[in-house]
Amino acid sequence: VPASNGAAAANGGPEAQAAQGTQAAQGTQRSQAKELRRQALLTAAASLFAKNGFNRVSLEDLGAAAGVSGPAVYRHFRGKQAVLGDLLLTVSRELLEGGLRVVAETTDPLAALRRLVAFQVDFALGKPDVIRVQDRDFSNLTEKDQAEVRTLQRNYVELWVEVLARLHPDTDAAELRMRAHATFGLINSTPHSVRSHGRKIAARSAGPVLESMALAALTAEASQASP
């Protein structure tokens, strides 16, 4: 049954509905453009902070690297410290969420460990600048952001410890935690150290080597100390 004139007015005619659709599409485009600009600023921040250090990078530097003016950065972040916080919080959440997905894909602990190692290697080779920023500029975060990053990363470490405990049920959790941290050190430091010596690392060749070394360290049986 056709709608009455009153109902049509209430619901909006074809022209009104078309206008609403256009406004919604424009709003979506603006949101997408804003998010792309935000991501560009974070990418620029990772590169500049890694190269020069947090304290030597200005908002004008960040804006110029992302193609905007310094004051325009405030449309996306409260300030430079907020950029650093967003950068390290985002990557910490990505690590934890990615690790949880990896572990959920299999019930076999060795397969889960292999996937965790591959996941960490991909991260290290893909985002060496972020790792450098974390190591050098963590203290420049606000206390609130420091606490949240620590919590996220602690949960990520414990995810590894839980998988390792299934492979080494008789090994103390503290030792398993040490293995996990040592493995992160091995994996995370290699891309930056090779690049800093003037040689560009090829993920294609470095990835399998790092994965093999990490798995060997994680799966080795602990040697007993001599009496």
Predicted regions and their residues:
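Amphipathic alpha-helical segments used for helix-helix packing
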Residues: L125-K144, H192-R195
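Hydrophobic alpha-helical segments that form the core
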Residues: V1-G6, Q23-Q26, A173-V194, S205-A217
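Helical hydrophobic small-molecule/effector-binding pocket
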Residues: L113-D135, F184
